[in-house]
């Protein structure tokens, strides 16, 4: 009977401990391909560390360092989201205005929800810091428990809204990629039947009247084909501009990397220039000291030998 009670007690204690531990194993369910996703992952990782409520977290919460770090990560994330959204807007091309407005509205709403979640989190941590300061040395275990529960709920909400924003941006991106193709296809679908009708009418006319009409139909067909080719060329030019823009960005990043490498080499050379004279001076002093010791030793030995002979 005692053994049974011991097993039950251990089970209850294990359940209580598991309920009190913060859930810090959640991961965002996508690859961090875009800069805004990478920035959000940095925010997410920092929040996971805050949720542990370790002694270091408690200390940094009380001196507002945590809220400052979260503010920087929030601003970085939202800046990257805005930049990515602007880039997609420029790539939409010939898309219907109502489609453009609808996609932009959906992305804007998802972006606003994610920003509100981050702001709510920062305000809650600031509130916790103020509450701890008012406790005046009393136990803050209840405050930590409430904060831990609130952080778990906010992490779930953040994950939900972040994934929703990612899906909205994916739809936006698909619209940007397919916009030009849809525009060219729509023009071809509208003009194709007209060209075919002109050919059929020309074939049905008599030999005496058909030739002028055939010539006009041919000219019309040529103009239509020229227009289609022009639209296609514009779409290709737009894609080429996008590729050139990406290449320019990559080139700038390589240039910045090279500048950082050169600065590091310059700094290394400066350090070497600073310390080499010190090392050489120490070597000279050490050599002089060794010479003095050797001279003193030789002097002592030379004076002791005659005394032994006497």
Curated annotation (Swiss-Prot):
Keyword Transport among UniProt keywords: yes
Region LDL and other lipoprotein receptors binding, residue ranges: 150-160
Segments of this protein annotated with the region 8 X 22 AA approximate tandem repeats: 72-247
Signal peptide start-end: 1-18
Modified residues (Methionine sulfoxide): 135
PTM summary: APOE exists as multiple glycosylated and sialylated glycoforms within cells and in plasma. The extent of glycosylation and sialylation are tissue and context specific.
Keywords: Chylomicron, Endosome, Extracellular matrix, Glycoprotein, HDL, Heparin-binding, Lipid transport, Lipid-binding, Oxidation, Phosphoprotein, Repeat, Secreted, Signal, Transport, VLDL
Residues covered by region (Homooligomerization): 258-310
GO molecular function, one term: cholesterol transfer activity
Keyword Membrane in record: no
Superkingdom in the source lineage: Eukaryota
Region (LDL receptor binding): 150-160
One cellular component term from this protein's GO annotations in UniProt: extracellular exosome
UniProt-annotated binding residues for heparin: 154-157, 221-228
Region Specificity for association with VLDL, annotated ranges: 270-282
Primary localization: secreted
Stated family: Belongs to the apolipoprotein A1/A4/E family.
PANTHER family reported for this sequence: APOLIPOPROTEIN, APOLIPOPROTEIN E
Protein purpose: APOE is an apolipoprotein, a protein associating with lipid particles, that mainly functions in lipoprotein-mediated lipid transport between organs via the plasma and interstitial fluids. APOE is a core component of plasma lipoproteins and is involved in their production, conversion and clearance. Apolipoproteins are amphipathic molecules that interact both with lipids of the lipoprotein particle core and the aqueous environment of the plasma.
Complexes and interactors: Homotetramer. May interact with ABCA1; functionally associated with ABCA1 in the biogenesis of HDLs. May interact with APP/A4 amyloid-beta peptide; the interaction is extremely stable in vitro but its physiological significance is unclear. May interact with MAPT. May interact with MAP2. In the cerebrospinal fluid, interacts with secreted SORL1. Interacts with PMEL; this allows the loading of PMEL luminal fragment on ILVs to induce fibril nucleation.
Name used for this protein in its record: Apolipoprotein E
Organism (species): Grammomys surdaster (African woodland thicket rat)
Taxonomic classification: Eukaryota, Metazoa, Chordata, Craniata, Vertebrata
GN (gene name): Apoe
């Amino acid at each position: 009977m005692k053994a049974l009670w011991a097993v039950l007690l251990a089970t209850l204690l294990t359940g209580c401990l598991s309920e009190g531990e913060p859930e810090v194993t959640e991961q965002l369910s996508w690859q961090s391909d875009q800069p805004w996703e990478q920035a959000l992952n940095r925010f997410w990782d920092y929040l996971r560390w805050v949720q542990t409520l370790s002694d270091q977290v408690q200390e940094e919460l009380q001196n507002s360092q945590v809220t400052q770090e979260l503010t920087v990560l929030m601003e970085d994330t939202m800046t990257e989201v805005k930049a990515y959204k602007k880039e997609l807007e420029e790539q939409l091309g010939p898309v219907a205005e109502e489609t453009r407005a609808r996609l932009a509205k959906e992305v804007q709403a998802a972006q606003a929800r994610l920003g509100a979640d981050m702001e709510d989190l920062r305000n809650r941590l600031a509130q916790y810091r103020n509450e701890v300061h008012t406790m005046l040395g009393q136990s803050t275990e209840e405050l930590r428990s409430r904060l831990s529960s609130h952080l778990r709920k906010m992490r779930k909400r953040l994950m939900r809204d972040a994934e929703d924003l990612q899906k909205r941006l994916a739809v936006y991106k698909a619209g940007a990629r397919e916009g030009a193709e849809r525009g060219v296809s729509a023009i071809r679908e509208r003009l194709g039947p007209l060209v075919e009708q002109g050919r059929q009418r020309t074939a049905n006319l008599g030999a005496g009247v058909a030739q002028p009409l055939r010539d006009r139909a041919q000219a019309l067909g040529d103009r239509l084909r020229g227009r289609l080719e022009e639209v296609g060329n514009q779409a290709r030019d737009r894609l080429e501009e996008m590729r050139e823009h990406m290449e320019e960005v990559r080139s700038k990043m390589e240039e910045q990397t090279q500048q950082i490498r050169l600065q590091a080499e310059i700094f290394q050379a400066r350090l070497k220039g600073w310390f080499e004279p010190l090392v050489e001076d120490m070597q000279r002093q050490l050599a002089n000291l060794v010479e003095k010791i050797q001279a003193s030793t030789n002097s002592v030995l030379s004076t002791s030998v005659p005394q032994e002979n006497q």
